[in-house]
Amino acid sequence: MSLKELMAGLLLCLTFNTLLAEVRIYEGKVMDNSGKPLEFANVALQSLEDSTLIDGSVTDAEGKFAVRGSVVPVFLRISAMGFEDRIIDNPTSDSGDIMLSPASYMLGEVIVKGSRPMAKLKGGGVQVAVSGTYLANTGTALEVLGKIPFVAKSGSSIEVLGKGTPIIYINGRQVRDMSELDQLASTDIKSVDVITNPGARYASTVNSVIKISTVAHAGEGLSFNDRTTVGYKHYAYLFEQVNFNWRRNGFDIFGMLNYENYRERPRFSNTTFQYLKSGIVQQNSSGLEAAKYPVYQGKIGLNYNVSSHNLGFYYDFSFKSSSSIGRSLTNRYIDRVFSETLENFYDINRHNRQQLFSAYYTGEVGKLRLSANFDALWQINDRHTTENEITTMNPERDFTTCNDVKNRLFAGNLIASLPVWKGDFRFGTEISNIHRTDVYSGNAEFIRRNDIKISETTTALFAEAEQTFGLVSASVGLRWEHTDSKYRQSGQLSEDQSRRYHNLAPSVMLSSPIGNVNARLAYVRKTSRLAFEQLSSAVKYIDRYSYESGNPDLKPIYRDYFSASATWKDLVIEMEYSSTKNYFMWQTSEYPGSDDATLLTMVNMPRFNSFGAYINWSPTFFDCWHPVLMAGVQAQDFEISHADKIMKLNLPLGTFRFDNAINLPWGVWVNIDFSARTSGNCDNLYLKPYWQCNMGLYKSFDKDSWSVKLQLNDVFGTWRQDMVSYDALSSIFSKKIYDTRDLSITVRYNFNSARSRYKGRGAGNTDKSRL
């Protein structure tokens, strides 16, 4: 059956379901006797005739719930540990505030056993429960994400299969540094949402979103937690982090200090073939580098929650100074005849300083829900390089280069939502302003100086409606974006390179149960604009025969995604088709004025199509073994011109993962995880296969006040980055080797555990990523 036929069949089933029953949504807010919201209260919608369970839910952090059922005589049963049950006969659509009274007695020791599917369709993606499951004993948020359906983890990198690198949020706040995922303990995570079809509320450049929600700890006064990680990966390393929070009567002061000292020694070997007018040039290169990455980071902020209003701000600063020294050796051949040997020694020093001020407000005025965010970001990044170049054909030369970049971002958004008819209507606006300076210079005549200034303002408006018709839920959204970019070279405005973009990004989603299967169809349109470095016309020196430059004439990428998803018990399936226009990639051309040097720059490619299918199965056996089996395949009809011939790059790429979490006696958890990737094509790359095995032991003590995690990644040292890239004039066979066998031990201590109630989402989040 073709993908189009499957989508048509699912859509037909969804249409029939609208005729089956008239369904009403029952909403409300559960509070304790002091008026505070109750999280995790159980809400059951039952028939008045025979008490048959129709639907059930659990209240969120604000005490809110929503259940749905046919319009027949029903009643609501609300229960929570430590409180008397509350029964509401014949409830209306909005039950308002529901107050529970404290129980006059407490139960003795009770053991309740049950099971529920860990993953379910929600919104434009899949939601996975973490709290109360084996995933809570994984260690860190980064390790949890590596076990989530349709998510692939490689080192500290996270990718959503078929969608690339996601935007990640923790409690609505964007994660800008992946080390934040190592800082968050898995025991503090409530749930993870993987949104593969982000709607109009997200920027049109966002292809996927991961939202992490944390457990809301009760209690007031001072709380803090400390995390210490020591490990060995050829070099010893240390991570140290302290979080604190002081809470009283809805008022929070929170902060964080983080220090990291990390080193690595990447090695590489490349074989490059270039098809130039002077002949076929072959370069065999190898190199070794030693790098240090110390990190100093801190944060302080405050938060105030009163009734249905929340506001707060924080200030975050970081200083990252890295240094690396290395050597590369290249043997050069022309038409298979040895030409010369090129040897480079380099010393690179980088300094990255960042300051971020972020503020937010959320509240309710009647039925209108409001959310406002403001962010101000300053970055100073500099890179200083000293090189010594020795060749057998030319004189030795020493030179230095310097690249100084400064970024400033102001961004704000305002989002409003209110119940309309049988659902919600959400609308809002977002504005961001960026100013960037990029100065590149060197002390040699063959290095061009560039002084570039870019100022860019983006304005966005969006509207999104969600409605329920019978058993069918529908969502329709539209986002409009306008970007005005001014490009200046050496103080002079360049009209050709200054841009104005107008973009419309629609989204449509339908979901409904079909028997025991929950199904969803979705369409979204997304765009991608280049990072500012890729728009720079500055020509940067790589080696005697290689230069690199951005391309200010590039057009944005446009992608149309069509997807079908379904869940059944412990099984989750997703199929996807996408069409990509103006995809950009690196291309090699002959350097102007030279017969043997090349220039690497980005160009737009013709439209191509991609296909993907993914399946995730997460059962439980014997109440102690929790395996997860995930498999996926991606295919494309991509083709390029290579060495004056058309090359088709359409070999499917397979991804597999087999995770195992085993609960041993004495509360010890063992994790044994396998992952693998087949060979195949991805864009203009041919990726070679690899496999990897990770193992871990986890144990908590004193009611989770202490925890210890022993982890060994890449047990057999099999992970490699091995690939071949193709463009018009070159093919590059590259292999990068890292010290991926990594032994570490992490000790955490929690005192009076309480997480900040900060609920800001941030603004200009995709622009922060571009910076």
Question: What spans do the regions from the language model cover?
Answer:
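Short acidic/polar hinge/loop motifs at secondary-structure boundaries
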Residues: 68, 147-149, 173-199, 242
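Short, acidic, small-residue-rich periplasmic hinge/interaction motif at the N-terminus
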Residues: 44-46, 79-83, 95-134, 153-155, ...
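Outer-membrane beta-barrel signature, preferentially recognizing the C-terminal barrel domain
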Residues: 453-456, 496-499, 527-581, 598-611, ...
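Outer membrane beta-barrel strand-and-loop segments of large Gram-negative receptors
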Residues: 409-413, 460, 555, 572-630, ...
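Surface-exposed extracellular loop regions of Gram-negative outer-membrane beta-barrel proteins
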Residues: 482-489, 512-561, 576-595, 715-726
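Short, acidic Ser/Thr/Gly-rich low-complexity loop/linker segments typical of extracellular
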Residues: 49-64
